[in-house]
Design a protein with these regions (language model features):
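Enzymes that bind and transform nitrogen-containing heteroaromatic metabolites
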Residues: 1-160
Length: 160
């Protein structure tokens, strides 16, 4: 199963200058719980935005740079090759960035979103979720608090 996972603003903003636009510890906790022990597919810039590789996950990085080989990662030059290197029986998570989401939404089985209830100026956006193709099967609202600076909702969509 291929799942897209992302934190997305009301205007579908993902980030700016290769950085997230908010700090939501509850979102990080959910991301870790869902992706731990699985293959995660990402673009090079998304990988480079992490201070170090994420523990307990197999990193598949998509890059067109020929000699790009960060330690402990599988590097491929296309989304198709990224999917091919992941075991078929595994749950695979696509974790960004914007172009990788745009390419992969057509082949995804599921989308796990943290919808941040605010709009931001951004340079990277998540593709529209077409409700003719996707069904919302889970929604859980969380008000902002001392640790999470914005209201947000965990949402899960499955392909119809």
């Amino acid at each position: 199963m291929i799942t897209l996972i992302a934190a997305v603003a009301e205007n579908n903003a993902l980030g700016k200058d290769n950085q997230l636009l908010w700090h939501l510890p509850e979102d990080f906790k959910r991301f870790k719980a869902l992706t731990s022990g699985h293959y995660i597919i990402m673009g090079r810039k998304t990988f480079e935005s992490f201070p170090k590789p994420l523990p307990n996950r197999t990193h598949v990085v998509i890059s067109r740079q020929k000699n790009y080989q960060p330690e402990g990662c599988i590097v491929v030059d296309s989304l198709e090759k990224a999917i091919e290197v992941c075991p078929k029986e595994e749950d695979v998570f696509v974790i960004g960035g914007g172009q990788i989401y745009k390419q992969s939404i057509a082949i995804a089985d599921k989308v796990d979103i943290t919808r941040v209830h605010h709009s931001f100026e951004a340079d990277t956006f998540f593709p529209e979720i077409n409700l003719d193709e996707w069904q919302l099967v889970f929604s859980e609202f969380h008000p902002k608090d001392e640790r999470n600076q914005f209201d947000f909702t965990f949402q899960t969509f499955v392909r119809k």
